[in-house]
């Protein structure tokens, strides 16, 4: 079954922003205004994948630090931290700003302690003092605000207070995949911050997700905390526009019945290797991504393809067990074999996608990796789904339908 997904276009402001000197999407300006509004404590940006939620979050951190303080950005995976660090560097250079950012996870913290020869507490104080932006994960964020790093020395709350005095602009990216414990910790940190904030130095929280979970919003509303939900303005199927920017290109989506009990993606790859070869022959500048549900399946596929003389394209690997060196090397390969590590936020310049999915959420998230970058003659997605999913699609859409 084949479906054509029409391109998506995001509405832009009519005028160039006088501060950033670039044209912003409607939702980006709304986020900036909301963060600067003293009557709004918490903002949810639910703009679509590819519509610049990262830039929407960075602009207040770049230009409003005098009032907001420093920026603390929390991401659900370390892979996403690394990817977003590139975005910070890209935008700070493009906007000609000197921004000191720091990646903070268990590995970088250990390396910093080893290199500087100081204690963990002093290391965290140094990072807080030196960095304009800190990119971390929700677990490190929780350990800081729950006094974990300063349990046995003097005022156990001192380090947490230091961080929350400096970092009064807190961003949670892809928060819909936070587990229940992480959601609880986020709510706890919001309560802690509000209890310690003053009217002169308020704390602002920004949540980013194209597929938001309502749990956090409902909990905040029940607590009587003011929130603002911001959405993008979109049109579909345009050929050209002076008022909108194309954020997702037309995609040819093919739904293929593929049962895990029959070998799943591994069998499909073996049976359709020549089809993939032909795609790369027809479109030699193409870059592709294959996302499977299992790390072990991914590694078996990588090994199988590299040992198969019939495979005429180069292979890369990006899983939770893949070293940074191999991940970096994979960026130059024609087809990257990946897992859920790349589900959220990670930006690939690809025009060919094959993927399994666990549920409707991962179906949309993985499909959202495709069509984000111009310059390719075609954008092709093959979704490997159970029989009943394909049947449900067939009940709703005719073969070769066009949908937005």
What are the residue ranges of the model-derived segments?
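N-terminal helicase ATP-binding lobe
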Residues: 1-404
């Amino acid at each position: 079954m084949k479906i054509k997904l029409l391109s998506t276009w995001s509405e832009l402001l009519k005028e160039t922003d006088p501060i950033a000197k670039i044209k912003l999407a409607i939702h980006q300006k709304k986020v900036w205004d909301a963060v600067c509004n003293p009557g709004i404590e918490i903002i949810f940006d639910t703009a679509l994948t590819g519509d610049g939620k990262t830039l929407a979050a960075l602009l207040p951190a770049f230009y409003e630090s005098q009032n907001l303080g420093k920026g603390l950005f929390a991401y659900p995976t370390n892979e996403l931290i690394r990817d977003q660090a590139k975005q910070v560097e890209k935008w700070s250079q493009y906007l000609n700003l000197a921004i000191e950012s720091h990646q903070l996870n268990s590995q970088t913290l250990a390396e910093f302690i080893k290199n500087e020869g100081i204690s963990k507490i002093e290391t965290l104080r140094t990072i807080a003092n030196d960095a304009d932006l800190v990119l971390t994960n929700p677990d490190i964020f929780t350990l800081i605000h729950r006094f974990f790093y300063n349990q046995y020395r003097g005022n156990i709350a001192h380090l947490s207070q230091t961080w929350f005095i400096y970092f009064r602009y807190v961003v949670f990216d892809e928060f819909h995949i936070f587990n229940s414990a992480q959601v609880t910790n986020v709510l706890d940190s919001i309560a802690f911050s509000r209890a310690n904030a003053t009217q002169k130095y308020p704390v602002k929280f920004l949540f980013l997700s194209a597929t938001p979970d309502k749990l956090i919003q409902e909990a905040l509303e029940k607590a009587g905390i003011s929130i603002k939900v911001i959405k993008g303005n979109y049109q579909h199927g345009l050929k050209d526009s002076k008022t909108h920017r194309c954020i997702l290109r037309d995609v040819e989506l093919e739904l293929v019945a593929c049962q895990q009990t029959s070998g799943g993606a591994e069998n499909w790859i073996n049976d359709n290797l020549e089809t993939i070869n032909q795609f790369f022959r027809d479109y030699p500048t193409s870059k592709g991504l294959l996302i499977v549900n299992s790390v072990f399946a991914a590694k078996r596929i990588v090994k199988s393809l590299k040992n198969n003389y019939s495979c005429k394209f180069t292979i890369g690997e990006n899983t939770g067990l893949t070293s940074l060196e191999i991940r970096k090397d994979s960026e130059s390969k024609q087809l990257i074999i990946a897992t859920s590590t790349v589900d959220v936020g990670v930006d690939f310049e690809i025009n060919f996608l094959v993927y399994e999915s666990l549920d409707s959420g991962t179906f949309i998230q993985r499909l959202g990796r495709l069509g984000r970058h111009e310059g390719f003659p075609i954008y092709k997605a093959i979704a490997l789904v159970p029989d009943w999913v394909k049947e449900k699609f067939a009940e709703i859409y005719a073969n070769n339908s066009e949908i937005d």
